[in-house]
């Protein structure tokens, strides 16, 4: 059986991989070579020590990152006051989170969150992170309910 795979010189034969070409006419795939695809989900590099694993460890530590002792009712007016890098609150599905500590951990960069600081970010969050459990991700950052 080994002889089948050896050439007359005793070396393994070099096999050529056949080149298969699919013409656009025989394919249902549309090609858009003229315009490059704009990918809004571009990941940025985070600083060492600020990976999602590091964030998970911080959350698991139980440290209160919300800035409040216990959950409070938050009005839209109060939410709007917290829109800086040092004091960044967002609302997702009726819950308000202080995401100031999370900013350097966000894979797409801080600006993506800061663009929605002080506002209800449910729609944009669901557009890009529908599969993410924000309650678990931000449980130690929970400020209260949006009223």
From Swiss-Prot:
* MF-aspect GO terms: cytochrome-b5 reductase activity, acting on NAD(P)H; heme binding; metal ion binding
Renumbered to this chain, the Polar residues biased-composition regions fall at 15-29
What segment(s) does the record annotate as region Disordered?
1-37
Name of the protein described by the UniProt record: Uncharacterized protein C1F12.10c
Q: Which domain of life is it from?
A: Eukaryota
Give Gene Ontology CC terms. Answer: cytoplasm; cytosol; nucleus
Q: Which family does it belong to?
A: Belongs to the cytochrome b5 family.
Source organism per UniProt: Schizosaccharomyces pombe (strain 972 / ATCC 24843)
